[in-house]
Amino acid sequence: MAKILCNYFGLSMAAEGKSEFVGRQAAAFLGYVQQDAERCAENCGCAEDLNDAPEEIKREILRNDEELRRREQTAPGVEHDVVAIYDNAGIPSIMHRFRRVTNKELFGGSDTVHPAFIIGGEVYDEIYISVYENTMINGKPYSLPLQEPVTNITMEDFAQACFSKGEGWHCLTAAEWGLLADTSLKLGTLPHGNTNCSHWHGDDKEQGIIIEDSYKTLTGSGPATWTHDHTASGVHDLCGNIWEFARGVRIRDGALWAAENNDAALPETDLTECGDGWKPITDAEGHPLYVAVEDNKITFNTYPSVHRDYCGCVWGNVRMNCDSEQLRALALFAGEEKAGCYVDSTEGEYILVRGGRWGSGGSAGVFASSLSSPRSYARGSFGGRSAYFKKH
Protein backbone atom coordinates (compact mmCIF):
# COMPACT_ATOMS: atom_id res chain seq x y z
CA MET A 1 0.00 0.00 0.00
CA ALA A 2 1.15 3.52 -0.81
CA LYS A 3 -0.17 7.00 -0.03
CA ILE A 4 0.47 10.37 -1.58
CA LEU A 5 -0.71 13.97 -1.26
CA CYS A 6 0.22 16.53 -3.92
CA ASN A 7 -0.36 20.28 -3.75
CA TYR A 8 0.18 23.01 -6.31
CA PHE A 9 -1.12 26.56 -5.74
CA GLY A 10 -4.23 25.27 -3.98
CA LEU A 11 -4.77 22.35 -6.36
CA SER A 12 -4.43 19.11 -4.45
CA MET A 13 -4.51 15.40 -5.23
CA ALA A 14 -4.64 12.54 -2.73
CA ALA A 15 -4.31 8.85 -3.59
CA GLU A 16 -4.09 5.66 -1.58
CA GLY A 17 -3.76 2.08 -2.83
CA LYS A 18 -1.36 -0.15 -4.70
CA SER A 19 1.97 1.41 -5.61
CA GLU A 20 1.27 1.17 -9.34
CA PHE A 21 -2.05 2.99 -8.95
CA VAL A 22 -0.59 5.73 -6.75
CA GLY A 23 2.29 6.18 -9.18
CA ARG A 24 -0.11 6.70 -12.07
CA GLN A 25 -2.06 9.28 -10.07
CA ALA A 26 1.12 11.18 -9.20
CA ALA A 27 2.33 11.13 -12.80
CA ALA A 28 -1.01 12.42 -14.06
CA PHE A 29 -1.06 15.19 -11.46
CA LEU A 30 2.48 16.28 -12.29
CA GLY A 31 1.49 16.38 -15.95
CA TYR A 32 -1.37 18.73 -15.18
CA VAL A 33 0.90 20.84 -12.99
CA GLN A 34 3.23 21.34 -15.94
CA GLN A 35 0.34 22.20 -18.25
CA ASP A 36 -0.93 24.73 -15.70
CA ALA A 37 2.50 26.31 -15.35
CA GLU A 38 2.86 26.59 -19.12
CA ARG A 39 -0.58 28.18 -19.38
CA CYS A 40 0.35 30.64 -16.63
CA ALA A 41 3.47 31.53 -18.57
CA GLU A 42 1.39 32.23 -21.68
CA ASN A 43 -1.13 34.36 -19.79
CA CYS A 44 1.08 36.07 -17.23
CA GLY A 45 4.47 36.09 -18.92
CA CYS A 46 6.24 34.33 -16.08
CA ALA A 47 6.58 30.77 -14.81
CA GLU A 48 9.36 28.32 -14.13
CA ASP A 49 9.90 25.45 -16.51
CA LEU A 50 9.09 22.41 -14.41
CA ASN A 51 11.49 20.31 -16.47
CA ASP A 52 14.38 22.36 -15.10
CA ALA A 53 13.92 21.14 -11.56
CA PRO A 54 11.62 18.10 -11.43
CA GLU A 55 13.08 16.77 -8.19
CA GLU A 56 12.55 20.09 -6.42
CA ILE A 57 8.96 20.17 -7.58
CA LYS A 58 8.40 16.63 -6.40
CA ARG A 59 9.92 17.34 -3.00
CA GLU A 60 7.72 20.42 -2.68
CA ILE A 61 4.41 18.75 -3.54
CA LEU A 62 4.79 15.34 -1.93
CA ARG A 63 3.67 15.22 1.71
CA ASN A 64 3.99 12.52 4.35
CA ASP A 65 1.39 9.99 5.47
CA GLU A 66 0.36 12.04 8.48
CA GLU A 67 -0.56 15.01 6.29
CA LEU A 68 -2.47 12.76 3.90
CA ARG A 69 -4.63 11.47 6.75
CA ARG A 70 -5.38 14.97 8.01
CA ARG A 71 -8.87 16.24 7.16
CA GLU A 72 -9.79 19.93 7.26
CA GLN A 73 -13.00 20.57 9.20
CA THR A 74 -15.11 23.09 7.25
CA ALA A 75 -18.34 23.12 9.26
CA PRO A 76 -19.83 20.90 11.95
CA GLY A 77 -20.34 17.53 10.31
CA VAL A 78 -18.83 18.54 6.97
CA GLU A 79 -15.37 17.50 5.83
CA HIS A 80 -13.84 17.68 2.39
CA ASP A 81 -10.88 16.54 0.36
CA VAL A 82 -9.75 17.48 -3.11
CA VAL A 83 -9.25 14.45 -5.33
CA ALA A 84 -8.88 13.55 -8.99
CA ILE A 85 -11.63 11.26 -10.30
CA TYR A 86 -11.38 9.67 -13.75
CA ASP A 87 -14.39 9.16 -16.01
CA ASN A 88 -15.02 6.44 -18.60
CA ALA A 89 -12.84 8.31 -21.10
CA GLY A 90 -9.85 8.10 -18.76
CA ILE A 91 -9.68 11.86 -18.18
CA PRO A 92 -9.59 13.23 -14.61
CA SER A 93 -11.68 15.93 -13.01
CA ILE A 94 -10.59 17.76 -9.87
CA MET A 95 -13.38 17.15 -7.37
CA HIS A 96 -14.23 18.25 -3.85
CA ARG A 97 -15.44 15.53 -1.46
CA PHE A 98 -18.19 16.54 0.97
CA ARG A 99 -19.17 14.20 3.76
CA ARG A 100 -22.70 13.56 4.99
CA VAL A 101 -24.25 16.28 7.14
CA THR A 102 -27.68 16.87 8.65
CA ASN A 103 -29.82 19.95 8.27
CA LYS A 104 -29.41 20.53 12.01
CA GLU A 105 -25.62 20.55 11.77
CA LEU A 106 -25.66 22.78 8.71
CA PHE A 107 -28.28 25.41 9.48
CA GLY A 108 -30.11 24.47 12.66
CA GLY A 109 -32.90 22.52 10.98
CA SER A 110 -34.11 19.02 11.77
CA ASP A 111 -31.96 15.93 12.26
CA THR A 112 -32.79 14.90 8.69
CA VAL A 113 -29.80 14.17 6.45
CA HIS A 114 -29.29 17.02 4.00
CA PRO A 115 -31.04 16.07 0.72
CA ALA A 116 -27.80 16.24 -1.28
CA PHE A 117 -26.79 12.93 0.37
CA ILE A 118 -30.05 11.05 -0.30
CA ILE A 119 -30.07 9.56 -3.79
CA GLY A 120 -32.62 7.03 -4.98
CA GLY A 121 -33.84 6.58 -1.42
CA GLU A 122 -30.37 5.64 -0.15
CA VAL A 123 -28.20 7.73 2.16
CA TYR A 124 -24.66 8.33 0.94
CA ASP A 125 -21.70 9.15 3.17
CA GLU A 126 -20.09 11.44 0.63
CA ILE A 127 -20.57 13.21 -2.67
CA TYR A 128 -18.08 14.92 -4.97
CA ILE A 129 -18.53 18.35 -6.55
CA SER A 130 -16.41 19.91 -9.30
CA VAL A 131 -13.85 22.33 -7.92
CA TYR A 132 -14.08 24.31 -11.16
CA GLU A 133 -16.77 25.32 -13.61
CA ASN A 134 -16.54 22.72 -16.33
CA THR A 135 -14.86 22.87 -19.70
CA MET A 136 -15.68 20.50 -22.56
CA ILE A 137 -13.27 17.87 -23.93
CA ASN A 138 -14.63 15.65 -26.70
CA GLY A 139 -18.20 16.37 -25.69
CA LYS A 140 -17.72 15.60 -21.99
CA PRO A 141 -17.47 18.17 -19.16
CA TYR A 142 -14.40 18.29 -16.91
CA SER A 143 -13.34 20.16 -13.78
CA LEU A 144 -9.88 21.51 -14.56
CA PRO A 145 -8.10 24.74 -13.60
CA LEU A 146 -7.35 27.66 -15.91
CA GLN A 147 -9.79 26.61 -18.63
CA GLU A 148 -12.57 28.44 -20.43
CA PRO A 149 -15.91 27.36 -18.94
CA VAL A 150 -18.37 25.86 -21.38
CA THR A 151 -21.34 28.06 -22.27
CA ASN A 152 -23.99 28.23 -25.01
CA ILE A 153 -25.43 24.86 -24.06
CA THR A 154 -28.89 23.95 -22.79
CA MET A 155 -29.34 22.47 -19.35
CA GLU A 156 -30.55 19.14 -20.74
CA ASP A 157 -27.66 18.85 -23.19
CA PHE A 158 -25.22 19.61 -20.38
CA ALA A 159 -26.92 17.07 -18.10
CA GLN A 160 -26.73 14.37 -20.76
CA ALA A 161 -23.05 15.15 -21.31
CA CYS A 162 -22.48 14.67 -17.58
CA PHE A 163 -24.36 11.36 -17.54
CA SER A 164 -22.24 10.18 -20.49
CA LYS A 165 -19.13 10.24 -18.27
CA GLY A 166 -20.24 7.04 -16.54
CA GLU A 167 -22.15 5.81 -13.51
CA GLY A 168 -22.48 8.35 -10.73
CA TRP A 169 -21.63 11.37 -12.87
CA HIS A 170 -24.31 14.04 -13.22
CA CYS A 171 -24.99 17.75 -13.61
CA LEU A 172 -24.69 19.59 -10.31
CA THR A 173 -28.11 19.53 -8.69
CA ALA A 174 -30.10 22.15 -6.84
CA ALA A 175 -29.65 20.12 -3.64
CA GLU A 176 -25.87 20.10 -4.08
CA TRP A 177 -25.77 23.83 -4.78
CA GLY A 178 -27.85 24.28 -1.64
CA LEU A 179 -25.21 22.34 0.32
CA LEU A 180 -22.47 24.64 -0.99
CA ALA A 181 -24.37 27.84 -0.25
CA ASP A 182 -25.48 26.73 3.21
CA THR A 183 -21.93 25.64 4.03
CA SER A 184 -20.52 29.02 2.96
CA LEU A 185 -23.11 30.81 5.07
CA LYS A 186 -22.33 28.60 8.07
CA LEU A 187 -18.62 29.33 7.73
CA GLY A 188 -19.08 33.05 7.18
CA THR A 189 -17.23 32.74 3.86
CA LEU A 190 -19.75 33.80 1.22
CA PRO A 191 -17.64 33.69 -1.94
CA HIS A 192 -16.55 36.69 -3.98
CA GLY A 193 -16.04 36.30 -7.71
CA ASN A 194 -15.97 37.74 -11.21
CA THR A 195 -18.87 40.16 -10.92
CA ASN A 196 -17.40 43.15 -12.77
CA CYS A 197 -15.76 42.06 -16.02
CA SER A 198 -12.96 39.91 -14.51
CA HIS A 199 -12.91 41.78 -11.16
CA TRP A 200 -14.95 41.51 -7.98
CA HIS A 201 -17.21 44.55 -7.67
CA GLY A 202 -16.37 44.95 -3.98
CA ASP A 203 -12.60 45.20 -4.47
CA ASP A 204 -11.07 45.84 -7.88
CA LYS A 205 -7.82 44.22 -6.72
CA GLU A 206 -9.56 40.84 -6.67
CA GLN A 207 -9.19 39.71 -10.26
CA GLY A 208 -9.11 36.56 -12.35
CA ILE A 209 -7.43 35.89 -15.69
CA ILE A 210 -9.74 37.28 -18.35
CA ILE A 211 -10.55 35.23 -21.46
CA GLU A 212 -9.77 36.99 -24.73
CA ASP A 213 -12.77 38.67 -26.39
CA SER A 214 -14.84 37.98 -23.29
CA TYR A 215 -15.47 39.19 -19.75
CA LYS A 216 -15.36 35.64 -18.41
CA THR A 217 -12.34 34.47 -16.45
CA LEU A 218 -10.42 31.21 -16.61
CA THR A 219 -11.65 28.62 -14.14
CA GLY A 220 -10.05 28.93 -10.72
CA SER A 221 -7.89 31.90 -11.71
CA GLY A 222 -9.20 34.21 -8.98
CA PRO A 223 -7.96 34.57 -5.39
CA ALA A 224 -8.91 32.29 -2.49
CA THR A 225 -11.84 34.55 -1.57
CA TRP A 226 -13.48 33.35 -4.80
CA THR A 227 -14.11 29.93 -3.25
CA HIS A 228 -16.87 28.62 -1.01
CA ASP A 229 -14.63 28.53 2.08
CA HIS A 230 -12.10 31.26 1.20
CA THR A 231 -9.27 28.74 0.89
CA ALA A 232 -7.27 28.08 -2.25
CA SER A 233 -8.53 24.48 -2.24
CA GLY A 234 -12.22 25.44 -2.03
CA VAL A 235 -14.88 25.21 -4.74
CA HIS A 236 -14.23 28.07 -7.16
CA ASP A 237 -16.38 30.58 -9.04
CA LEU A 238 -19.76 30.09 -7.37
CA CYS A 239 -20.27 33.86 -7.45
CA GLY A 240 -20.39 35.51 -10.86
CA ASN A 241 -18.48 34.54 -14.01
CA ILE A 242 -21.37 32.51 -15.48
CA TRP A 243 -24.82 31.45 -14.33
CA GLU A 244 -24.71 27.73 -13.49
CA PHE A 245 -27.35 25.07 -13.97
CA ALA A 246 -28.79 23.71 -10.72
CA ARG A 247 -30.75 20.74 -12.02
CA GLY A 248 -33.79 19.53 -10.16
CA VAL A 249 -35.76 22.71 -9.32
CA ARG A 250 -38.17 24.63 -11.51
CA ILE A 251 -41.20 26.90 -11.45
CA ARG A 252 -44.17 25.92 -13.60
CA ASP A 253 -47.28 28.06 -13.87
CA GLY A 254 -46.30 29.79 -10.64
CA ALA A 255 -45.80 26.57 -8.63
CA LEU A 256 -42.43 25.41 -7.26
CA TRP A 257 -41.28 21.87 -8.03
CA ALA A 258 -38.18 19.81 -7.22
CA ALA A 259 -36.80 16.34 -7.68
CA GLU A 260 -37.09 14.27 -4.51
CA ASN A 261 -33.99 14.78 -2.34
CA ASN A 262 -31.03 14.43 -4.76
CA ASP A 263 -32.71 12.19 -7.32
CA ALA A 264 -31.83 14.73 -10.02
CA ALA A 265 -28.41 13.02 -9.89
CA LEU A 266 -29.94 9.87 -11.44
CA PRO A 267 -30.37 9.54 -15.22
CA GLU A 268 -33.52 7.47 -14.70
CA THR A 269 -35.29 10.32 -12.89
CA ASP A 270 -37.68 11.80 -15.46
CA LEU A 271 -37.26 15.55 -15.24
CA THR A 272 -38.69 16.37 -18.64
CA GLU A 273 -41.37 19.05 -18.54
CA CYS A 274 -44.14 16.49 -18.00
CA GLY A 275 -41.95 13.91 -16.24
CA ASP A 276 -43.01 12.11 -13.07
CA GLY A 277 -39.76 12.96 -11.25
CA TRP A 278 -41.11 16.34 -10.17
CA LYS A 279 -42.57 16.74 -6.67
CA PRO A 280 -44.09 19.91 -5.16
CA ILE A 281 -41.78 21.95 -2.94
CA THR A 282 -43.62 22.20 0.37
CA ASP A 283 -43.70 24.06 3.66
CA ALA A 284 -43.28 22.50 7.11
CA GLU A 285 -46.87 21.19 7.04
CA GLY A 286 -46.66 19.71 3.56
CA HIS A 287 -48.47 22.48 1.69
CA PRO A 288 -47.25 23.10 -1.88
CA LEU A 289 -45.46 26.41 -2.43
CA TYR A 290 -46.16 29.05 -5.06
CA VAL A 291 -44.59 32.35 -6.07
CA ALA A 292 -46.63 35.50 -6.63
CA VAL A 293 -45.17 38.41 -8.58
CA GLU A 294 -46.97 41.75 -8.41
CA ASP A 295 -45.80 45.37 -8.61
CA ASN A 296 -42.14 44.32 -8.76
CA LYS A 297 -42.50 42.29 -5.57
CA ILE A 298 -41.86 38.57 -5.12
CA THR A 299 -43.77 36.57 -2.51
CA PHE A 300 -43.48 32.87 -1.61
CA ASN A 301 -46.91 31.57 -0.53
CA THR A 302 -48.72 28.33 0.29
CA TYR A 303 -51.53 29.10 -2.16
CA PRO A 304 -51.69 29.91 -5.88
CA SER A 305 -51.92 33.54 -6.87
CA VAL A 306 -53.59 35.42 -9.69
CA HIS A 307 -50.63 37.82 -9.60
CA ARG A 308 -48.20 36.20 -12.01
CA ASP A 309 -45.51 38.21 -13.72
CA TYR A 310 -41.73 38.51 -14.03
CA CYS A 311 -39.64 40.35 -11.46
CA GLY A 312 -36.11 40.62 -10.23
CA CYS A 313 -35.08 42.00 -6.86
CA VAL A 314 -32.61 41.28 -4.08
CA TRP A 315 -33.34 38.40 -1.71
CA GLY A 316 -33.62 40.83 1.17
CA ASN A 317 -36.80 42.23 -0.41
CA VAL A 318 -38.45 38.86 -1.10
CA ARG A 319 -41.45 38.11 1.11
CA MET A 320 -41.55 34.62 2.62
CA ASN A 321 -45.09 33.84 3.78
CA CYS A 322 -44.16 30.26 4.58
CA ASP A 323 -41.86 28.17 6.76
CA SER A 324 -40.02 25.62 4.63
CA GLU A 325 -36.96 23.61 5.64
CA GLN A 326 -36.86 22.34 2.07
CA LEU A 327 -36.28 25.86 0.74
CA ARG A 328 -33.60 26.35 3.38
CA ALA A 329 -31.82 23.15 2.33
CA LEU A 330 -31.96 24.31 -1.30
CA ALA A 331 -30.58 27.73 -0.27
CA LEU A 332 -33.63 29.44 -1.75
CA PHE A 333 -33.89 32.12 0.90
CA ALA A 334 -32.22 35.39 1.91
CA GLY A 335 -28.94 33.87 3.07
CA GLU A 336 -27.24 36.66 1.15
CA GLU A 337 -29.59 39.64 1.25
CA LYS A 338 -28.04 41.57 -1.63
CA ALA A 339 -27.97 38.57 -3.97
CA GLY A 340 -30.49 38.65 -6.80
CA CYS A 341 -33.71 36.66 -7.01
CA TYR A 342 -35.37 36.54 -10.43
CA VAL A 343 -38.70 34.79 -10.95
CA ASP A 344 -41.07 34.35 -13.88
CA SER A 345 -44.36 33.09 -12.48
CA THR A 346 -46.28 33.40 -15.73
CA GLU A 347 -47.59 30.40 -17.64
CA GLY A 348 -44.88 27.94 -18.58
CA GLU A 349 -41.81 26.25 -17.13
CA TYR A 350 -38.61 27.99 -16.05
CA ILE A 351 -35.46 26.27 -14.80
CA LEU A 352 -33.11 27.25 -11.98
CA VAL A 353 -29.68 28.77 -12.58
CA ARG A 354 -27.51 30.17 -9.82
CA GLY A 355 -24.59 32.43 -8.95
CA GLY A 356 -24.87 35.35 -11.37
CA ARG A 357 -22.49 36.34 -14.16
CA TRP A 358 -19.52 38.56 -14.90
CA GLY A 359 -21.60 41.76 -15.03
CA SER A 360 -24.02 41.12 -12.17
CA GLY A 361 -22.24 43.33 -9.65
CA GLY A 362 -23.67 43.20 -6.14
CA SER A 363 -26.59 41.00 -7.19
CA ALA A 364 -24.25 38.06 -7.87
CA GLY A 365 -23.51 35.55 -5.15
CA VAL A 366 -23.79 31.92 -4.16
CA PHE A 367 -27.41 32.65 -3.12
CA ALA A 368 -28.27 34.42 -6.39
CA SER A 369 -31.01 32.53 -8.21
CA SER A 370 -32.97 32.85 -11.41
CA LEU A 371 -36.16 30.94 -12.19
CA SER A 372 -36.84 32.80 -15.41
CA SER A 373 -35.33 30.87 -18.34
CA PRO A 374 -36.98 28.08 -20.35
CA ARG A 375 -35.10 24.80 -20.49
CA SER A 376 -34.47 25.37 -24.21
CA TYR A 377 -32.25 28.40 -23.58
CA ALA A 378 -28.56 28.24 -24.44
CA ARG A 379 -26.76 31.46 -23.57
CA GLY A 380 -23.23 32.75 -23.54
CA SER A 381 -23.61 33.34 -19.81
CA PHE A 382 -25.03 29.87 -18.95
CA GLY A 383 -22.85 26.88 -18.08
CA GLY A 384 -22.40 24.34 -15.33
CA ARG A 385 -20.32 21.86 -13.43
CA SER A 386 -20.53 18.12 -12.93
CA ALA A 387 -20.78 16.19 -9.69
CA TYR A 388 -20.25 12.54 -8.78
CA PHE A 389 -21.27 9.87 -6.29
CA LYS A 390 -20.04 6.31 -6.00
CA LYS A 391 -23.19 4.26 -6.44
CA HIS A 392 -23.96 1.61 -3.81
Language model segments and positions:
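C-terminal, surface-exposed recognition/capping segments
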Residues: E55, R59, R63, G178, ...
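Charged, compositionally biased non-catalytic regions
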Residues: G45, A53-H80
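Carbohydrate-recognition beta-sandwich/jelly-roll modules
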Residues: E72-D81, I85-G121, I281, D309-C311, ...
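Extracellular adhesion/carbohydrate-recognition regions
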Residues: E79-G168, D253-I298, R385
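Compositionally biased, non-globular sequence tracts
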Residues: M1-I57
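A short local loop/turn or secondary-structure capping micro-motif enriched for an aromatic residue
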Residues: V22-R24, R252-A255
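Short secondary-structure boundary/capping segments
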Residues: L185-L190, R250, E260-N261
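Short aromatic-cysteine micro-motif
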Residues: T112-L238, I242, T269
